[in-house]
Amino acid sequence: MPRFPDQLLYIGGRYVPARGGHTLEVVNPATGEVLANVHNAGVDDLDAAVDSAKAGQQRWAALTTVERSRILLRAVALLRERNDALAQLETLNTGKPLSETRSVDVVTGADVLEYYAGVAQALQGAQVPLREGSFFYTRHEPLGVVGAIGAWNYPIQIALWKAAPALAAGNAMIFKPSEVTPLTALKLAEIFTEAGLPDGVFNVLPGDGASVGTALTEHPQIEKISFTGGTATGRKVMASASSSSLKEVTMELGGKSPLIVCADADLDVAADIAMMANFYSSGQVCTNGTRVFVPRALRHAFEARLLARVQRIHIGDPLDERTTFGPLASAAHMQRVLEHIEQGKAEGARLLCGGERLQDGALVQGYYVAPTIFSDCTDVMTIVREEIFGPVLSLLTYDDEDEAVTRANATTYGLAAGVVTPDLARAHRLIHRLEAGICWVNTWGESPAPMPVGGYKQSGVGRENGLATLQAYTRTKSVQIELERYASVF
């Protein structure tokens, strides 16, 4: 029997069953246990959600920005009050260690909601004089009903990153969580309703892409789509959204990010950064620095430091607060990661550690893959070129800065990049040449609410977070006012 009762759709401020009657199993990846049967939304459910969202958005947009901000801040307070319970649910559904979900997932999502609740009041137009008797002004108006599609690695955080600017700007949102990890998005919908959000302003439609995802991107009454996921799926979403009704899109997509360790770097600091950039959340982070470039002369010393740190990883039950490394999110994803590892071996990369599924003792039913490090990698290897989205670090050597930058940029991706060096002049010189939307110097992975997040090239379109994202959920209206008698040429 599933641990939780059937999970319904959330439309119009309440739970409703899917009209088609179909459900999807949601599994605990640490044990293989079925957590719940979740109703699988279809096109009829989407139409109902759009009708609800249109009605709710009219009420929501009619409120002042101060009134909207107060409601969003009440939701922030509820999120923080329920952090532990939400984190535990997130851990059950994603397999991420409780030590992570308690300190990062809900916390950072709430931070973003708090940020937009504050800056929403600064969303102002401009008044510009043209001549003595004429001027124009601009208004930032909400788009209306927007759609969002989340990924399975940071379910509640992604839901909040997408909902916060959209709602702060006066829109309604229909959110489709990943069918793998939909549970906390439903709890978020409850919290928004409890905080006072008008019914219909935040609807949640669990379901797979075939049943509801494609319909969401094509729906003519949805004005914008925000998507987080893989690049291949992102292309399909973008094509569908544009071909149906020229929707605006925001895309936070995949990456194969470089981390350049400079010759003057503290190798202990660099190894700590490389570990976090590859094995946090079991490697299921889009910004992971999976291509680690190290000077050829430092390779062996750096390998030794990495291997020593791998020994300190605590692999186990994600609900155990001592655990720092959990399973992958699903059996299917685990299999894809293992296939990439086998390809790395076949193409000649030298396996330093890991490279296998973990099935000892209590791990036997879970989707655990050992922290894996390959050395002697080359740029043409599949594990170096393709996003794996798992705990697989590829170590590459270089001889000079120009070579490192050229090879770091030789990818279709451009999400993130990092440099480790005590020389800030060198750091800026390298960072300014790296083709990536998010760059870190002597650190990795932090994405505070005011910091825009997004990629270059095929890693995305538009940005999440930051002030510009709030404006991206509005449309600008220009209004000219003539104070003098209008002079016609006829």
Curated annotation (Swiss-Prot):
Record GO terms (molecular function)? betaine-aldehyde dehydrogenase (NAD+) activity; metal ion binding
**KW Nucleus (keyword) present:** no
> Which PROSITE patterns would you find in this protein's record?
ALDEHYDE_DEHYDR_CYS (PS00070), ALDEHYDE_DEHYDR_GLU (PS00687)
- Any binding details for the cofactor? Binds 2 potassium ions per subunit.
Q: Which residues bind K(+) 2?
A: L246, K457, G460
SUPFAM superfamilies reported in the protein's UniProt record: ALDH-like (SSF53720)
Locate the residues binding K(+) 1: N93, V180
- Amino-acid positions noted as binding NAD(+) in the UniProt annotation, renumbered to this chain: G150, A151, W152, K176, P177, S178, E179, G230, T231, A232, T233, G254, C286, E387
- Which keywords appear in this protein's UniProt record, sorted alphabetically? Metal-binding, NAD, NADP, Oxidation, Oxidoreductase, Potassium
Q: What class of enzyme is it?
A: oxidoreductase
The superkingdom of the source organism is Bacteria
Give the record's GO biological process terms. Answer: glycine betaine biosynthetic process from choline
Q: Which cofactor does it need?
A: K(+)
Instruction: List the catalytic activities from the record.
Output: betaine aldehyde + NAD(+) + H2O = glycine betaine + NADH + 2 H(+)
Which residues carry the site feature described as Seems to be a necessary countercharge to the potassium cations?
E248
Q: Which residues form the active site?
A: K162 (charge relay system), E252 (proton acceptor), C286 (nucleophile), E464 (charge relay system)
Family per record: Belongs to the aldehyde dehydrogenase family.
Subunit structure as annotated in this protein's UniProt entry: Dimer of dimers.
This molecule's function is given as:
Involved in the biosynthesis of the osmoprotectant glycine betaine. Catalyzes the irreversible oxidation of betaine aldehyde to the corresponding acid.
Q: What is this protein called?
A: Betaine aldehyde dehydrogenase
Q: Which organism is it from?
A: Xanthomonas axonopodis pv. citri (strain 306)
